[in-house]
Amino acid sequence: MQLPHQHNVIMTLPASAPQQAPTRVYRMAAMLLGIGSLHFIAPKPFDSIVPAELPGSPRFYTYASGVAEVGIGAALLAPKTRRLAALAAVALYISVFPANVNMVRLWFQDPSKSLPMRIVAIARLPFQVPMILEALKVYRAS
């Protein structure tokens, strides 16, 4: 025996997007907090990709981007600051892109870097786009 309007049950289930929003926020916050912390725990790899054209010490930029990443990651966890933090994440992802491009340039000039390492350096460049899009989704949903 079929219940009345049984076919509507599937169609009226809540959309999964709102349920994924907290996961998106927590994933982004965890990534920023983790990578940001690494800027202080092991700064040398980050120092090495700071473009030489920038004035001042590479360590300054390593620590500054680490502070930004940790701060944005923490701000994403608080609903009151989430919207602004998501917008800051977009700006951060755009601002560190030149360092990622510089890493590709440096690794292709360094004979000690293997071909797989060079490929990884290039392959990670397009990942900035989905990171920016995820931050924009958090911004719009906050």
Identify what each model region corresponds to.
Residues M1-S142:
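Short amphipathic, positively biased membrane-proximal segments
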